[in-house]
């Protein structure tokens, strides 16, 4: 059974004439109902940016945050699947249903250049027609969406864990480790997070700020750690690492003070591609690459004044500046030169299947520090190739020219000529299949016992190196030995260590009793009432803010 979904058009009265050239194709959404009545998504991905958003009065902060969420690839995929609204029991006033409608209308009807008005369900509980902190609104929205998902899960499965699509996309785990400096005993505590706050007071780059987050902190004097093994307060060290990496990484540059709201307006560089592996508590396997897809920017002196806007990366790879109703194209250089407030990165574990592709050839070049070190050493000890001293043309061009000038027919004639000179005759007697294949390739067989390695080389046709001296080749011919295609290498056993969509509960099964914290904002007042925490066996509840 195939059901086509259609959605109402955006308000034409809010159309932006100048934005119509930025949008082209309207996506087509088709939900296929499987045998067990679970919808599987099959849709043509929207390529352009979403609609502009109307400023209803000091609402630029929420417009900028909503644009970043709308262009979050995993979240957009989930919203466009309409999976949540099909199971929601109370869609009226539901934040998840409201976000689903917002993302769907913005992305599926962006071809006409319409300007949307954000839903009051998303804004009314927070927006009071005055400037607010965009990061605070962002975390408030994610929290309320998470709570909406939990209500649906608890109604259908009362014993279900406190997980949701919001946790699956944005959620990660901190590991806080305290080590007693006397007995060397350690105590680990794990806390959930939706964003990573970075202290930029002394950092020149995001990478440096991430390293500063993991610096060891000494606990002495009044802050000494009570060691269960020593049975008294002892000096200790405390370190904080990311234990479980999220699918979408939100890096919040702490530009505003907690009390006065004054802004730290300094330049902090950030990369287009980020490797999170060095900052993990257990950095195993290959690189863990992330790609930048959105940047939230603030212009002004305090968080309660000035102006907010954002940059987003569309599915086809182009960048756009989303400034309320204005949607303008830009380049990545402009994006990387901004004084960013919140950075949005999406995990790129599977480079060929993600929404925003990172160039495969640049993975090691951009992300792996060890590769950079080896590369610099090779440059120092690399000898000058005699091929480059040829006054004719570079060796790569000569190889291409030689390859192009030798056709398949000429190669067959040359092969037959070489066979005759080598004195090889084809017999009509019954041959072993392996010998038939070897003769077709023009290879000689040794009568004595052949090693397994040599058998493999002959099967691959690599014994040509032994017959180069017998071939009658032109004087200017170049023999190129090509390996078999490596296109399918690694497909049978892909890297499973850096898979996205980490399950926090699965990571904690082999650990000691764990402290799970509530979802909190970096700073600012709480706008919503959290559900009652269940004191599960072996856990103590910890409020992490």
UniProtKB/Swiss-Prot annotation:
Record region (Disordered): 368-442, 489-539
Cited CDD domains: Peptidase_C19E (cd02661)
GO molecular-function terms, A-Z: cysteine-type deubiquitinase activity
Catalytic residues (positions): 60 (nucleophile), 307 (proton acceptor)
Disulfide bonds: none
Any one of the GO CC terms: endoplasmic reticulum
Gene Ontology BP annotations: chordate embryonic development; protein deubiquitination; proteolysis
Function: Deubiquitinating enzyme that removes conjugated ubiquitin from specific proteins to regulate different cellular processes. Important for preimplantation stage embryonic development.
Stored InterPro entries: Papain-like_cys_pep_sf, Peptidase_C19, Peptidase_C19_UCH, USP_CS, USP_dom
Expressed in which tissues: Expressed in T cells.
Sequence ranges of Basic residues compositional bias: 374-385, 524-537
Residue stretches of biased makeup (Basic and acidic residues): 393-404, 489-505
SUPFAM superfamilies listed in its UniProt record: Cysteine proteinases
Skewed-composition ranges (Polar residues): 508-519
Organism: Mus musculus (Mouse)
Induction info: Rapidly up-regulated in response to the cytokine IL2.
Outcome of swapping residue 133 to N: Abolishes deubiquitinating activity
EC number(s) from the headed UniProt entry: 3.4.19.12
Disruption phenotype: Embryonic lethal, with no survival beyond embryonic stage E5.5. Blastocysts fail to hatch and there is significant apoptosis of the trophectoderm. Cell proliferation may also be impaired. Blastocysts at stage E3.5 appear to have normal morphology.
Record carries keyword Nucleus: yes
Main location: nucleus
Name of the gene: Usp17lc
Protein name: Ubiquitin carboxyl-terminal hydrolase 17-like protein C
Keyword Endoplasmic reticulum applies: yes
Keywords carried by this UniProt record: Endoplasmic reticulum, Hydrolase, Nucleus, Protease, Thiol protease, Ubl conjugation pathway
Chemical reaction(s) catalysed: Thiol-dependent hydrolysis of ester, thioester, amide, peptide and isopeptide bonds formed by the C-terminal Gly of ubiquitin (a 76-residue protein attached to proteins as an intracellular targeting signal)
């Amino acid at each position: 059974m195939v059901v086509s979904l259609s959605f109402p058009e955006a308000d034409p009265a809010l159309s932006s004439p100048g934005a119509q050239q930025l949008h082209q194709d309207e996506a087509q959404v088709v939900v296929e109902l499987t045998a067990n009545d679970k919808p599987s998504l099959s849709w043509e991905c929207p390529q352009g940016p979403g609609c502009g958003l109307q400023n209803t009065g000091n609402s630029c902060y929420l417009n900028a945050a909503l644009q970043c969420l709308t262009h979050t690839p995993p979240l957009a995929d989930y919203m466009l699947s309409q999976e949540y609204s099909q199971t929601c029991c109370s869609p009226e006033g539901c934040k998840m249903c409201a976000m689903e409608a917002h993302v769907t209308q913005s992305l599926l009807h962006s071809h006409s250049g319409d300007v949307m008005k954000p839903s009051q369900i998303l804004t009314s509980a927070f927006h009071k027609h005055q400037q607010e902190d965009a990061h605070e609104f962002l975390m408030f929205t994610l929290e309320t969406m998470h709570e909406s998902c939990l209500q649906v899960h608890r109604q259908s499965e009362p014993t279900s864990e406190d997980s949701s699509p919001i946790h699956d996309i944005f959620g990660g785990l901190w590991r806080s480790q305290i080590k007693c400096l006397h007995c060397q005993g350690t105590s680990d505590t794990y806390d959930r997070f939706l964003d990573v706050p970075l202290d930029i007071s002394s950092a020149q780059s995001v990478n440096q700020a991430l390293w500063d987050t993991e610096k060891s902190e000494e606990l002495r004097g009044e802050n000494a750690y009570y060691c269960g093994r020593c049975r008294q307060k002892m000096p200790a060290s405390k370190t904080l690492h990311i234990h479980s990496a999220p699918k979408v990484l939100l890096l919040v540059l702490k530009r505003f003070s907690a009390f006065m709201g004054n802004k730290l307006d300094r330049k902090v560089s950030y990369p287009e591609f980020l490797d999170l592996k060095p900052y993990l508590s257990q950095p195993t396997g290959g690189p863990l690459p992330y790609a930048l897809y959105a940047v939230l920017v603030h212009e002004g002196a305090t968080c309660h004044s000035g102006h907010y806007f954002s940059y987003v990366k569309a599915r086809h790879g182009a960048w756009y500046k989303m400034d309320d109703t204005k949607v303008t194209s830009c380049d990545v250089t402009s994006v990387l030169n901004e004084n960013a407030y919140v950075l949005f990165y999406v995990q790129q574990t599977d480079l060929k299947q993600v929404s925003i592709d990172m160039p495969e050839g640049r993975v090691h070049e951009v992300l792996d520090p060890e590769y950079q070190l080896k590369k610099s050493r090779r440059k120092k000890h690399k000898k000058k190739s005699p091929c480059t001293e040829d006054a004719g043309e570079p060796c790569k061009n000569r190889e291409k020219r030689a390859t192009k000038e030798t056709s398949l027919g000429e190669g067959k004639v040359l092969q037959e000529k070489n066979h005759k000179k080598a004195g090889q005759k084809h017999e009509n007697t019954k041959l072993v299949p392996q010998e038939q294949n070897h003769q077709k390739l023009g290879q000689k067989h040794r009568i004595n016992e052949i090693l397994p390695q040599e058998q493999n080389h002959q099967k691959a046709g690599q014994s040509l190196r032994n017959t180069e001296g017998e071939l009658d080749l032109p004087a200017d011919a170049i023999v190129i030995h090509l390996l078999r295609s490596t296109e399918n290498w690694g497909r049978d056993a892909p890297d499973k260590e850096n898979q996205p969509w980490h399950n926090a509960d699965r990571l904690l099964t082999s650990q000691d009793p764990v402290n799970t914290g509530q979802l909190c904002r970096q700073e600012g007042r709480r706008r919503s009432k959290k559900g009652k925490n269940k004191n599960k066996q072996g856990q103590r509840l910890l409020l992490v803010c």
